[in-house]
Amino acid sequence: RSVCRQIKICRRRGGCYYKCTNRPY
């Protein structure tokens, strides 16, 4: 199984992208 969570990260410049993270939160 994949314990990966997809989070959306937005930068100040106005660029948003999705990143795969394994953070506890």
Curated annotation (Swiss-Prot):
GO terms for cellular component: extracellular region. It comes from Androctonus australis (Sahara scorpion). Transmembrane segments: none annotated. GO terms for biological process: defense response to bacterium; defense response to fungus; killing of cells of another organism. This is Androctonin. The keyword Disulfide bond applies. Signal peptide: none annotated. Active against both bacteria (Gram-positive and Gram-negative) and filamentous fungi. Acts on the membrane of the bacterial cells. It destabilize a membrane by modifying its properties. Disulfide bonds join C4-C20, C10-C16. It is found in: Secreted. It comes from the Eukaryota. Its main location: secreted. Keywords: Antibiotic, Antimicrobial, Disulfide bond, Fungicide, Secreted.
